[in-house]
């Protein structure tokens, strides 16, 4: 989840913000001002910035900052406390004397080189955690589409039409919409580790529950809860990467996360087809459950807490235990989970922003359409290669071209990440519109890939199967090259309200991903592969001007918006 920050967020802090969908407590920064005793004040403010939790009350933060800047210190002997309205202590015990200001005994990181700060962990530790979390994302996203390989068997066993059986995919993806609502706030209060470990365990359990279900209703219910419980990595992993990596590396790490999210649904049909042809559909879920169980063990053993405020809570607990001094504490220990605040940030405000912010609405529609095409292709590929070209045993192998296109695009985005860092360094502030440059290229390639794939696949008796296969690499490039820049642009355009903006995007994106597979079969069979592709390709082509429009007018739109970030 991306923490929502004050609109007074400075440019220096913004530069240290994540290019991902996540933001955490900022790096320790030196105070730069014209006050006396600047060095001492800088140290205090550095400590305050580091230990302040994103869920902490803004009022409390402002009070602390006011005390620091004015040099006010509370003298316990001069403070009169009125105990007249308090009940007695009990046992004839006297009321305690006035205590020093609580903030004097708050623990914080010991400077920017503190070894417990995730930024300072060894690269080996970070790499292991990164690999495990990316594999976890691949497993969760694989679970969404691997069920589609068993649809023919489910239709035959339970006597239902394909659109009913494919609901197993739809309900699973609908569960993803819960990730910004449930798991992001929980991870900000209780830390990343607990949320990810519990999610990994619950996801594995529900995969086995689907595999052993006796009726269709149980299958659908367990599929929904599998997606709902397993969705935590979709929101928490980007936040964990933001905890561990600074702005120079963070964007590249998020590229790997996005690659995992996209590769999973494409890789699972390749695996699923072999499993379904040689066994029953239940082994699709057994295999996913075994993979999820292994990752649950890996997450539990290798993943260390990365959430900065939660690390300080653990530090305070250890210090209290070793010193028996109950006054030592962390600021985050006083944070409580507010249901009303969660509802406001993740439900009410996102819906309002979606329909009042044209920038957010247009980019979200583009992003959601691309995500929907990802799941639509799961239905289109069997129609083209199995029904059209007669691929019986290896009908899902052409999916590999999609993955190749995504890998090429990842390298392409890594190159532009370096270019983006140079741009913000030169500008001295965030430049959200610069995120859209790779999207201009991907936006042109994407409709070309769709039209190429569908029209060559429309004539299987005249055109070799390699033609639509190669076209898949263009689609994969476009999927990745549009999705990630869209997400980054939303985050940096609505930096003060990034969590709400990302939640709005996730809601609509999940809805598109869930619904597109339902009509894909009817569309391709009813209209024909070529004409269905023409409709989708023209819609994708109509969206090509979107990044160009915001490259030219985006800054002006943000300046006139009441919610967008503008420096």
From Swiss-Prot:
Glycans are attached at residue 120. This is Multidrug transporter TPO1_1. PANTHER family: MAJOR FACILITATOR SUPERFAMILY (PTHR23502), POLYAMINE TRANSPORTER 1 (PTHR23502:SF31). Induction: Expression is up-regulated by clotrimazole. Pfam families: MFS_1. It is a multi-pass membrane protein. Coiled coil: none annotated. PROSITE patterns: MFS. The gene is TPO1_1. Disruption phenotype: Leads to intracellular accumulation of clotrimazole and increases the susceptibility to clotrimazole but also to other imidazoles such as miconazole, ketoconazole, and tioconazole; as well as triazoles such as itraconazole and fluconazole. Also increases susceptibility to other antifungal drug families such as the polyene amphotericin B, the pyrimide analog flucytosine, the fungicide mancozeb, and the polyamine spermine. Decreases virulence in a Galleria mellonella model of infection. GO terms for cellular component: cellular bud membrane; fungal-type vacuole membrane; plasma membrane. It comes from Candida glabrata (strain ATCC 2001 / BCRC 20586 / JCM 3761 / NBRC 0622 / NRRL Y-65 / CBS 138). Residues 1-71 are annotated as: Disordered. Multidrug resistance transporter involved in resistance to azole antifungal drugs such as the imidazoles miconazole, ketoconazole, and tioconazole; as well as the triazoles itraconazole and fluconazole. Also plays a role in the resistance to other antifungal drug families such as the polyene amphotericin B, the pyrimide analog flucytosine, the fungicide mancozeb, and the polyamine spermine. Decreases the intracellular accumulation of clotrimazole by mediating its extrusion from cells. Involved in virulence by conferring resistance to the human antimicrobial peptide histatin-5. Belongs to the major facilitator superfamily. DHA1 family. Polyamines/proton antiporter (TC 2.A.1.2.16) subfamily. It is found in: Cell membrane. The chain crosses the membrane at residues 128-148, 157-177, 194-214, 224-244, 253-273, 283-303, 358-378, 396-416, 436-456, 471-491, 498-520, 531-551. Its main location: membrane. Signal peptide: none annotated.
